[in-house]
Amino acid sequence: MSSEKASSKSTPEAPWPVREVNTQVKQWIERLGHLWVEGQLAQINVKPNWKLSYLTLRDVEQEMSVQLTCPTDIIRNRPTPLKDGDRVIVYGKPAFYAGRGTFSLWVTDIRPVGIGELLARIEELRKRLAAEGLFDPARKKRLPFLPNRVGLITGRGSAAERDVLSVAKDRWPEVQFEVINTAVQGASAVPEIIEALRVLDQDPRVDVIIIARGGGSVEDLLPFSEEALQRAVAAAQTPVVSAIGHEPDTPVLDNVADLRAATPTDAAKRVVPDVAEERMLINQLRSRSAAALRGWVQREQQALAAIRTRPVLADPMTPINRRRDEIAQAVGLIRRDVTHLVRTEQALVASLRAQVSALGPSATLARGYSVVQVIPRDGSAPEVVTTIEQSPPGSQLRIRVADGSITAASMGTQQAN
């Protein structure tokens, strides 16, 4: 095919043949040049009589992989054999095999990632996540006292799974588990654990999630220090317990999880309460409550007995009789005082009456004197006559004497000598 046709656009009327597509892709890929690529070996396919070997290199955080092709001598002549799960750095050139339409990296060098370098990366990640606050105790969620259902992420048929289930059932036989088995090492561990965590976190029946593995080498535990897993655990709404069981070099998951357990067995003990211990505690609390109640009753009985010994309760009528005598005495005093007061006031009234009688008009009238009043013709009130001008002849008079009054008329007046 001419370059002119190769550079033309494909159309329904002039489509490209497969060979042209593969040729164009091959030319574009081969322009990428050599690359250093890091990943985790997942499949190693080596045959003694093969000149070429085929491997799969997986991303450590995402479900992605790339095929590797390399001379068998590179693998055969290594001092330490390669195995699935090894973290490596490969040097190769992207290659596209036009005949089969497949992509691969043609590798000429494979180097294992050193433990020291991996640990340095883990510590760098640990510092970065700590600076973001993912290790902050304030953000850690409290575990439920008695979970309704426990989510368990662990390897299929592993000792960690057996330990968690057996210990939990021994402690609380009614506890329920939702178990999801995943890879716990190797390239597929991180994506599988993240997916299992997502499923359990969305299950409303699950109250707490345990991620368990029974220890292992530093290389085996690398998935539990991958950043993607830490982000997923930090974002989970359900409390997460890390039970990896590796004391010397703790994975980053131990710092991000809401609770770190030393071993899977320890995780079961921390998550599930012991029914025997709880019953014992209930019995102790019941005994303490009963003892406290008995003590209170005894104190109240003693106080009641002390009250009963008081004189007022020994003879309740004594204070009443005492008060009755006091009241009778007070009544006698009041009567005496009132009688004396009445007599004193009566004597005073008699004295005043005598004075009034002696000084009043009645006594004067009794001695022959009278009071003369003129009665006005206009009907107004009578006036006492003190001068002759007040009673001209013909005036109507009222003369008051000791035993009544006399109506008279003025016949005339006479001036005093």
Curated annotation (Swiss-Prot):
Subunit structure: Heterooligomer composed of large and small subunits.
Protein localization: Cytoplasm
GO BP terms: DNA catabolic process
One GO cellular component term: exodeoxyribonuclease VII complex
EC id: 3.1.11.6
InterPro entries membership: Exonuc_VII_L, Exonuc_VII_lsu_C, OB-fold_nuc-bd_dom
Record-given protein name: Exodeoxyribonuclease 7 large subunit
Reactions catalysed: Exonucleolytic cleavage in either 5'- to 3'- or 3'- to 5'-direction to yield nucleoside 5'-phosphates
Alphabetical keyword list: Cytoplasm, Exonuclease, Hydrolase, Nuclease
Role summary: Bidirectionally degrades single-stranded DNA into large acid-insoluble oligonucleotides, which are then degraded further into small acid-soluble oligonucleotides.
Family listed: Belongs to the XseA family.
Database matches in HAMAP family: Exonuc_7_L
Keyword Cytoplasm: yes
One GO molecular-function entry: exodeoxyribonuclease VII activity
